[in-house]
Amino acid sequence: MGQTVTTPLSLTLQHWGDVQRIASNQSVDVKKRRWVTFCSAEWPTFNVGWPQDGTFNLGIISQVKSRVFCPGPHGHPDQVPYIVTWEALAYDPPPWVKPFVSPKPPPLPTAPVLPPGPSAQPPSRSALYPALTPSIKSKPPKPQVLPDSGGPLIDLLTEDPPPYGAQPSSSARENNEEEAATTSEVSPPSPMVSRLRGRRDPPAADSTTSQAFPLRMGGDGQLQYWPFSSSDLYNWKNNNPSFSEDPGKLTALIESVLITHQPTWDDCQQLLGTLLTGEEKQRVLLEARKAVRGNDGRPTQLPNEVNAAFPLERPDWGYTTTEGRNHLVLYRQLLLAGLQNAGRSPTNLAKVKGITQGPNESPSAFLERLKEAYRRYTPYDPEDPGQETNVSMSFIWQSAPDIGRKLERLEDLKSKTLGDLVREAEKIFNKRETPEEREERIRREIEEKEERRRAEDEQRERERDRRRHREMSKLLATVVIGQRQDRQGGERRRPQLDKDQCAYCKEKGHWAKDCPKKPRGPRGPRPQTSLLTLGD
């Protein structure tokens, strides 16, 4: 039977769950398909010695990492999570990676290891961490040339050196060596280790475990330089909108980084290359160079003055000198001005008019959004006193309907400032009924409407009943009168006669039997009605 060859790539795929866990600890996310593609197809094309089956060699990983983090269009931001995870596997290898990790190089012959003194402590688990001298004397152990295998492996030869480090003089170097030999206290661990590997042992009490700044004050009072970490840049890029989508938010982020981290010229280029596209970066640099001012305080277009204040090529500014720090401060200020000017969109008043107050938005928050729209879509500054009238009118017309109507009816509206309008709007907003009160009012109005409708229905029913009763009463009265007339109908056909009135001729003075007009003689036979016979 043949045996399967295990490679670093196949090993990571077999332990993919551990790889994802390590990536999560680095605040990144990796996908298996892209992991295989980058390892076997992309990184071998960098010509740094990366094999198609992968490697855990820190030197090669660092070279690939430098190509991935290259600023400008030659960088590969989409590959950052994957090379960071590879680096984490090599720095702090899990048990299944340790057999494949390259052994630590032996010490150079020009740097012999001095045996420890009688009060020396066994070396710490990392070669970069100092050995603290205990107060209790112990038996000196055997000198150890290599650090413990469990410690983090960092190839110092492949780390990028600080770009602005000033070379110390020979006398200063000798003094530093004497101090290092005589003192019992040593400097805290490397800030880069603290930044990139938060899972290390806690450093000394006087060191920091927060994100390291590019320029920070060292223990001897001198500025020390530490570059941005890949995790910082990756998190800033992925946790914020793009510059084209929301320039204000990204400008605020870069402004906070410029103030707190005090980056150098190279750091600024790396920051812009990571957070901005190539076209956005060029626009920002152009606007920043336009903001350069001459000796008279007005914007200048002289190439020598512009290049001196905001160079496009790497300048020779030492951060250890006052002049160099002043140049860096001015450069950051101009860069911030370029970000603000480049973030302004073309004039579009329709965008400003489209900003309306939300149903539950406070007037203050609405005013901030309105001012931001003025800054972004118009060349006007909403804080300018000359633009206060325009902003006030927009605030009134684009407020919520109930607030806008009451603001329009204010007395002496023309003399009201924007602050007065905001205070009045806040009063109106705070007097609004709560959702519970609104529901109660609506319920009460519905009940009152139902009561009115029910009362109206009952009134109409009563009117209908009264009308029907009157009609029935009239009908019954008509029937009763008719029946009474029917009963008295015969008597009316024979009107009553007076005592001396004739019933035959209706004359008075005699009765009917003595009426001279009544025929006398026998009555004739009644005429017989002849019936037709069959013979007829």
Swiss-Prot record:
Coiled coil spans: 436-476
Motif PPXY motif positions after renumbering to this chain: 161-164
Posttranslational modification: RNA-binding phosphoprotein p12 is phosphorylated on serine residues.
Keywords per UniProt: Capsid protein, Coiled coil, Host cell membrane, Host endosome, Host membrane, Host-virus interaction, Lipoprotein, Membrane, Metal-binding, Myristate, Phosphoprotein, RNA-binding, Viral budding, Viral budding via the host ESCRT complexes, Viral nucleoprotein, Viral release from host cell, Virion, Zinc, Zinc-finger
Zn finger region (CCHC-type): 500-517
Compositional bias of kind Basic and acidic residues: 449-464, 484-517
Annotated positions of the Phosphoserine modification: 190
Positions marked as site (Cleavage): 129-130, 213-214, 476-477
Entry's Gene Ontology BP terms: viral budding via host ESCRT complex
InterPro entries, per database record: G_retro_matrix, G_retro_matrix_sf, Gag_p12, Gag_P30, Retrov_capsid_N, Retroviral_Gag-Pol_poly, Retrovr_matrix, Znf_CCHC
Chain positions of motif PTAP/PSAP motif: 109-112
Gene Ontology molecular functions: RNA binding; zinc ion binding
Location of region: Disordered: 108-218, 449-536
Gene Ontology CC entries for this record: host cell late endosome membrane; host cell plasma membrane; host multivesicular body; membrane; viral nucleocapsid
Biased composition (Pro residues): 108-121
Lipid-linked residues (N-myristoyl glycine): 2
Span of the annotated motif LYPX(n)L motif: 128-132
Name of the molecule in the record: Gag polyprotein
Lineage, opening ranks: Viruses, Riboviria, Pararnavirae, Artverviricota, Revtraviricetes
Protein encoded by which gene: gag
